[in-house]
UniProtKB/Swiss-Prot annotation:
<dbReference type="GO" id="GO:0009056">
    <property type="term" value="P:catabolic process"/>
</dbReference>
<keyword id="KW-0408">Iron</keyword>
<dbReference type="InterPro" id="IPR017941">
    <property type="entry name" value="Rieske_2Fe-2S"/>
</dbReference>
<feature type="binding site">
    <location>
        <position position="47"/>
    </location>
    <ligand>
        <name>[2Fe-2S] cluster</name>
    </ligand>
</feature>
<keyword id="KW-0813">Transport</keyword>
<feature type="domain" description="Rieske">
    <location>
        <begin position="6"/>
        <end position="101"/>
    </location>
</feature>
<comment type="similarity">
    <text>Belongs to the bacterial ring-hydroxylating dioxygenase ferredoxin component family.</text>
</comment>
<feature type="binding site">
    <location>
        <position position="67"/>
    </location>
    <ligand>
        <name>[2Fe-2S] cluster</name>
    </ligand>
</feature>
<feature type="binding site">
    <location>
        <position position="64"/>
    </location>
    <ligand>
        <name>[2Fe-2S] cluster</name>
    </ligand>
</feature>
<comment type="subunit">
    <text>The naphthalene dioxygenase (NDO) multicomponent enzyme system is composed of an electron transfer component and a dioxygenase component (iron sulfur protein (ISP)). The electron transfer component is composed of a ferredoxin reductase (NdoR) and a ferredoxin (NdoA), and the dioxygenase component is formed of a heterohexamer (trimer of heterodimers) of three large alpha subunits (NdoB) and three small beta subunits (NdoC).</text>
</comment>
<feature type="binding site">
    <location>
        <position position="45"/>
    </location>
    <ligand>
        <name>[2Fe-2S] cluster</name>
    </ligand>
</feature>
<dbReference type="GO" id="GO:0046872">
    <property type="term" value="F:metal ion binding"/>
</dbReference>
<keyword id="KW-0058">Aromatic hydrocarbons catabolism</keyword>
<comment type="function">
    <text>Component of the naphthalene dioxygenase (NDO) multicomponent enzyme system which catalyzes the incorporation of both atoms of molecular oxygen into naphthalene to form cis-(1R,2S)-dihydroxy-1,2-dihydronaphthalene. Functions as an intermediate electron transfer protein via a specific interaction with iron sulfur protein components (ISP) (NdoB and NdoC). Also able to catalyze the cis-dihydroxylation of biphenyl and phenanthrene.</text>
</comment>
<protein>
    <recommendedName>
        <fullName>Naphthalene 1,2-dioxygenase system, ferredoxin component</fullName>
    </recommendedName>
</protein>
<keyword id="KW-0411">Iron-sulfur</keyword>
<dbReference type="GO" id="GO:0051537">
    <property type="term" value="F:2 iron, 2 sulfur cluster binding"/>
</dbReference>
Length: 104
């Protein structure tokens, strides 16, 4: 499979310890800054229709604002009920102070 890096946002758009919702080529994503690294997941919770970008980020864990299920943003792993299905993650790289996402 060919890697397709797409520019998402400027690195400066993602605040330290925060989450940012973006749409890249029609796909809703959540971008996270965790300890100086940027991570990307789908923006919709696997349990309901809540946007992860409206959730609470604590360390590596994002809490869904609807039912308080949590995911590890680095791996996508579902961490507690009611979520049981992992959330999709996407490779990220920084190039010229721009956040690039691999959607392939």
């Amino acid at each position: 499979m060919t890697v397709k890096w797409i520019e998402a946002v400027a690195l400066s758009d993602i605040l330290e310890g925060d989450v940012l919702g973006v749409t890249v080529e029609g796909k809703e994503l959540a971008l996270y800054e965790v300890e100086g690294e940027i991570y990307a997941t789908d923006n919709l919770c696997t349990h309901g229709s809540a946007r992860m970008s409206d959730g609470y980020l604590e360390g590596r864990e994002i809490e869904c604002p609807l039912h308080q299920g949590r995911f590890d943003v680095c791996t996508g792993k579902a961490l507690c009920a009611p979520v049981t299905q992992n959330i999709k993650t996407y490779p990220v790289k920084i190039e010229n102070l721009r956040v690039m996402i691999d959607l392939s």
